[in-house]
């Protein structure tokens, strides 16, 4: 499991969500999920993409968000049903608390 957000790959996510065989389409989708997760973290916390690596627990958030989107077959994060672990971690590091 990658310790920095920038180190997370589609293979890491595939292993985390226990995909046995990963097609080219799956890899593309997983890369999209990683990008969506990073953007969500940036928007939620107010941190830049470069700053995400300063917080190792953001890597956990990426894994959880990707798994949630994969399981639900969506390409967006559902704010109304946000995982409590994700919400707690992001809340601890938010700089845009308006």
What are these regions (language model features)?
Residues 1-98:
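Divalent metal-cofactor coordination and adjacent catalytic microenvironments
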